[in-house]
Swiss-Prot record:
The lineage of its organism: Bacteria, Bacillati, Actinomycetota, Actinomycetes, Mycobacteriales. Pfam families: P-loop_SecA, SecA_DEAD, SecA_PP_bind, SecA_SW. Belongs to the SecA family. It is a peripheral membrane protein. This is Protein translocase subunit SecA 2. One of its GO terms (molecular function) is ATP binding. The keyword Membrane applies. Part of the Sec protein translocase complex. Interacts with the SecYEG preprotein conducting channel. Has a central role in coupling the hydrolysis of ATP to the transfer of proteins into and across the cell membrane, serving as an ATP-driven molecular motor driving the stepwise translocation of polypeptide chains across the membrane.
């Protein structure tokens, strides 16, 4: 234990004497020893810039991996029972300094080989140690992150910690738990998994295991559902301890600000159809450009003065910008405009089985259980002629970022951590450890082929794929959206190329399609490859044609355009050249691509082309890199600005959760109501048992606390819909949001306690049994969970407002 009373591991979350998320020992000044150069080694200065652990800590990990080889024979000579017993005898309580780490690695290597048939490479053991040090590791596709993660999970569990291996979907949670379960069992550890189909009892059992595999959604939904229970025995989610996150950049960056929502039945009205229809007419009008305008990167849309006048006239001559309508009618109009102008079918969503399904842009597949904020969801459904779905009342919500920050220790793994290093450091205080490949990467990455127009680019892509296919080399094509993937697929088929397509419309087939993408002559067209979870092996899943395909150059990756972040490009490139196999990649771009149009001055772009419309300037690569850096900077700003809004809500939620736990687990509710209403308490004490009276008091206090929090969330949602309009009055929207949120929260506690006192004093005494009639404290008859793809509010400043101590 360190001076903070926390295990000396890299995710100690104490804030009083050292930065949150980094251990005190990580901030001592070290003079690195001069050591022999290691594969993939970076300078210590570069490590510090990345927020990564010190050079000494990395050197210690390398030394431990080397030392573990001395124990390999001893581990191999142990029976299964003795191997399990040896694992249990390890002293790993102090993971940062334990002398038993080499023995642990040797036991883990032997257990993995016996139970999974996989013998971990040294780089996998190094990756496991860096995760045990609290870092996010970067390991290339095909290098064995799943096994490295299981070994790290075993290390934490043997140190007495409870580990949640956080995945991006249910399929990977169950697959990895069943795949790695025998390894953990061989080391005397228990493993469980959770999916959307798991019952409450199955969830409790899984969480009770040493290591639990579950998707980030399911973990979050369990946390939310626990905020409705009125009996401590109904709780499902345990206290958070260690989160080991697979595809860490996807979970911690791409989806960090996605709110997970618990909703209940309600009778709230949906947005007015007359406004949705009116906006549809505006957008479809031949003079539509006169009625609304979008910004340069198509992220925002607003009415022009002419458009506002037309809407006002159609709605009976109202003033959209009056106090009466600015926060209601104008907001509805803007939401409907967003649905009709900015959100495109087969790009942002698809329609299947008479329902709108969102597409996860970073994964290229349907975003399960995800929806837009209720007004926008209804507007899109109306746009597509689909019956509006029930919205419900938000009972509780938590962002993925706030969910993960609950854990005492956070670490993870991904193929593209370095590019997300800034966000990981800024929002989670996490370092990044790049892990060298087991075999040198010999993939050849060709310079971008840039065209003057999208049409010329698409022609070039089809010609290139056809040419590569004719020699039998397998091709993986990464597109940016569903519409593009289907259009390209159709063109290839017309050219006689037997391509298969993998996108959000057929993601159920993804494992089979990806597994065969390395076969001789295969052409696979796919939307984003992040988190697909299946390796592409040369020669197909059985590698029957491995040598033949390798001689042709291995898998050839084609990107149909740069993404807004380099990470997504690298995730696609990384599919080629796994485990030392040959491979190649090339990206096609045009001056009309979104990332270029939004981030470069069109008048300064070189325009000289060859006969096929390809730009001949040597500056194209640097210009594309610059456009991508600008786009990444904007995304970071959006993350930071949105975080500033969500952070206050997260802090308020933490106060509510603490108060709720106190009411749920102690006699506080009974004591407070006895003090507030002594006569009624004395009256009831003579009629009901102390245990029954305690239950009644707890139910009353919890109901009004939950009711107050749900009302507070609804109020904050209403504020956020129109807070940006405060800028018209020269007010800072963020400052105003914080002021209003803090003022409202300050009265929440008093109002909840006052309402509880009133219920306690006025509820009728039951005739047929001892107790009070609490039928008016009706909770939702049904609840459901989903994710909200929220539109981030943007602002440039953060005002530090303190939270009042509302509960004493």
């Amino acid at each position: 234990m360190n001076v903070h009373g926390c295990p000396r591991i890299a995710a100690c979350r104490c804030t009083d004497t050292h930065p949150r998320g980094r251990p005190a020992f990580a901030y001592r000044w070290f003079v690195p020893k001069t050591t022999r150069a290691q594969p993939g080694r970076l300078s210590s200065r570069f490590w510090r810039l990345l927020g990564a652990s010190t050079e000494k800590n990395r050197s210690r990990s390398l030394a431990d991996v080397t030392a573990s080889a001395e124990y390999d024979k001893e581990a191999a000579d142990l029976s299964d029972e003795k191997l399990r017993k040896a694992a249990g005898l390890l002293n790993l309580d102090d993971l940062a300094e334990s002398a038993d780490i080499p023995q642990f690695l040797a036991i883990a290597r032997e257990a993995a080989e016996r139970r999974t048939g996989l013998r971990p490479f040294d780089v996998q053991l190094l990756g496991a140690l860096r995760m045990l040090a609290g870092d996010v590791i970067e390991m290339a596709t095909g290098e064995g992150k799943t096994l490295a993660g299981a070994i790290a999970a075993a290390g934490y569990a043997l140190a007495g910690r409870h580990v949640h291996v956080v995945t991006i979907n249910d399929y990977l949670a169950r697959r990895d738990a069943e795949w790695m379960g025998p390894l953990l069992d061989a080391m005397g550890l228990t493993v469980g998994w959770i999916t959307a189909d798991s019952t409450p009892d199955e969830r409790r059992t899984a969480y009770d295991r040493d290591v639990t595999y579950a998707s980030v959604n399911e973990i979050g939904f369990d946390v939310l559902r626990d905020q409705l229970v009125t009996d401590v025995n109904d709780l499902v989610s345990p206290n958070p301890d260690v989160a080991l996150i697979d595809e860490a950049d996807s979970v911690l960056v791409d989806e960090a600000l996605v709110p997970l929502v618990l909703a209940g039945t309600t009778h709230r009205e949906t947005p007015r159809l007359e406004i949705i229809r009116l906006v549809a007419e505006l957008v479809g009008d031949k003079d539509a450009d006169e009625y609304f305008a979008t910004d340069s990167d198509n992220r925002n849309v607003h009415l022009t003065e002419h458009g506002a006048r037309k809407v006002e006239k159609a709605l009976g001559g109202i003033d959209l910008y009056s106090e009466e309508h600015v926060g209601t009618t104008l907001t509805e109009v803007n939401v409907a405009l967003h649905a009709h102008v900015l959100l495109q079918r087969d790009v942002h969503y698809i329609v299947r089985d008479d329902a709108v399904h969102l597409i996860n842009a970073s994964r290229g597949r349907i975003a399960q259980l995800q929806r837009w904020p209720d007004g926008l969801q209804a507007a899109v459904e109306a746009k597509e002629g689909i019956e509006t779905t029930e919205t419900g009342e938000v009972l509780d919500t938590i962002t993925v970022q706030a969910l993960i920050n609950r854990y005492a220790t956070v670490c993870g793994m991904t193929g593209t951590a370095l590019a997300a290093g800034e966000q990981l450091r800024q929002f989670y205080q996490l370092g990044v450890s790049p892990i060298p490949p087991n075999k040198p990467n010999i993939r050849e990455d060709e310079a971008d082929r840039v065209y003057i127009t999208t049409a010329a680019k698409n022609d070039g892509i089809v010609e290139h794929i056809t040419e590569v296919h004719q020699r039998g080399q397998p091709v993986l094509v990464g597109t940016r959206d569903v519409a593009e993937s289907e259009e390209l697929h159709e063109r290839l088929v017309r050219r006689g190329v037997p391509a298969v397509v993998l996108n959000a419309k057929n993601d159920a087939e993804e494992a089979r399609v990806i597994a065969e993408a390395g076969k001789y002559g295969a052409v696979t067209v796919s939307t984003q490859m992040a988190g697909r979870g299946t390796d592409i092996r040369l020669g197909g899943s059985d590698e029957a044609d491995h040598d033949r395909v390798a001689e042709l150059g291995g898998l050839h990756v084609v990107g149909t355009g740069r993404h807004h972040t380099e990470r997504l490009d690298n995730q696609l490139r990384g599919r080629a050249g796994r485990q030392g196999d040959p491979g190649s990649s090339v990206f096609f771009s045009s001056w009309e691509d979104d990332v270029v149009a939004a981030n470069l001055d069109h008048n300064k772009l070189p325009m000289a082309t060859d006969e096929n419309g390809r730009i001949v300037s040597p500056r194209t690569g640097s210009l594309l890199d610059h456009a991508q850096r600008v786009a990444e900077g904007r995304l970071l700003d959006v993350h930071a600005n949105t975080w500033r809004y969500n952070q206050l809500i997260a802090q308020q939620r933490a106060i509510i959760v603490e108060r709720r736990n106190t009411l749920l687990r102690t006699v506080t509710a009974r004591e407070e109501l006895a003090e507030l209403a002594p006569k009624r308490y004395e009256e009831l004490s003579d009629k009901v048992s102390e245990e029954r009276l305690e239950t009644i008091c707890r139910q009353i206090m919890l109901y009004h606390l939950d009711r107050g929090w749900a009302d507070h969330l609804a109020y904050l949602a209403d504020i956020r819909e129109s807070i940006h309009l405060r800028a018209l009055g020269r007010q800072n929207p963020l400052d105003e949001f914080h002021r209003m949120a803090v003022d409202a929260f300050a009265s929440l506690a008093a109002d909840a306690i006052e309402a509880a006192q009133q219920t306690f004093e006025t509820a009728n005494v039951l005739d047929h049994e001892p107790g009070l009639d609490l039928s008016k404290l009706a909770r939702p008859t049904s609840t459901w969970t989903y994710m909200v793809n929220d539109n981030p509010l943007s602002d440039d400043t953060l005002s530090a407002l303190s939270l009042p101590g509302v509960f004493r």
